[in-house]
Amino acid sequence: MNHIVLDAQAKTTIDALRKDLETELDDDMESIVTDGRYTYIQKIISTTVEKPKEKLTISDKIDKIVTNRFLGIPIFLLIMYIVYYISVTTVGTFVTDWTNDVFVVAIQDAVSGFLSSVGASGLLSAVIVDGIIGGVGAVIGFAPQMAILFLFLSILEDCGYMVRIAFVMDRVFRYFGLSGKSFIPLLIGSGCGIPAIMASKTIEQDNDRRLTIMTATFIPCGAKLPVIALLGGVMAGKVAGWQAAGFIAPAMYFVGIVAVLVAAIMLKKTKPFSGKPAPFVMELPEYHIPSAKTVLLHVWERLKGFLIKAGTILVVACIVIWFLSTFGFEGRSFGMVEDTANSLIAAIGDFIAPIFAPLGFGNWQSVASSLTGFSAKEAIVSTMGVLANVAGDPEDAVNVAAGEAKWFPTGMAALSFLIFNLLDSPCLAAISTMASELNDRKWFWFAIVFQNVYAYCISLMVYQIGSLVLYGTFGFWTVVAFIVLAFMLFMLFRPDPYKDQKVYSTRSVEA
């Protein structure tokens, strides 16, 4: 077979025509060629094959609205807002409040009474009641909110809507250098980051796959929901009003999506991540009424993983947290301390706190809570619950919320804390999965460093610039925040020097 040989001028002309065609049709060349083939086939069939005129199905009529290029994304954002609003406020908050204020307290009282009746020591009673039950109970209390969230997400997945969102978002993601294939792991990530990272195997191009692995955990997973609910549903709800609580939860989901897009734009303009996104072709299934059995099974599978982690990793974490917050040095002796400011966890937090001071939460309590989040994100809530219960009445949610609110001088500080723990490195299990999927020590450590530096920079800008706008606060770190903002804007809007670079996969896709 003879090959066509083109000179440099012909190649330049063809390349220019290709770019003009992609701009005019608002699509990539592979998709344009594929669409042209199907259009031509349809044209031939229409003149040679006779068949009754097909009527639009109900699915087709719905798709004309929910996959519309103008209405598709606003409808998706509205649906996700309603899902998170209902899950974290309204019904979710009512059940969670009952769990925290009645169920967990009743268990603490019953266990405490039983231990007293059998003559258990005060130390053992404190470990079990305050450390384990108090810490794990602080997380278990948010299980109803998680169950409601998983219920809504499972219904949307089973009815066929979620798969269409990947199709709708393909146009948006392609503009930012990714394809709709990268959005599928993000959808999965709303349940758990581990399967989201593993879902990146379906992405053929290595650079897009690495980028998706690095950013998939930016989407709030089920483990992060208690953290969002704590700061939004408890602190904002008890202290600042339920209006703020209802806004924070869905806002964090949108923050995660925006964080993914911003990171994608910046990284795609660097050589290691450059190249065009792979074409995204998928078959949309018919809409159908969700199966109650399937939906409930999905909810249970997601919730079971959370409960198992609460009964294993969190129990150990709560014991360690209780020990570190109960023991320390007072005077020259080591032992149980009455003031947690003299505890071991306070010493560790105080040592690291200056690093986080520019973010607005430079106190040992919030820093210690963030550090425990690297073992499991739910441990943040456990730590905050244990530390808040020491200073206040653990049976009074208002006192606990007020105690935690004192750790954050302003609302911007609490928001900064929330965003940092949303975007920083995930839990140890997800980190282990990242290492396995990247299969390269260099890329693994780059991913870890990028996630934490990125989270730090975003939180720094949120707190410093937000404080300047709302409170008129200005200082050295405000200047640093504007420098970081200027650098990110430069990376976002500079021309892409590697836009037309072709990238080939060097790794086969595993089933």
Label the predicted regions.
Residues 1-52:
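Alpha-helical transmembrane helix bundles of large polytopic membrane transport and channel proteins
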Residues 30, 46-59, 114-125, 282-297, ...:
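Short, membrane-interfacial amphipathic segments enriched in basic
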Residues 32, 90-132, 176, 197-212, ...:
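Extended, low-charge hydrophobic alpha-helical regions
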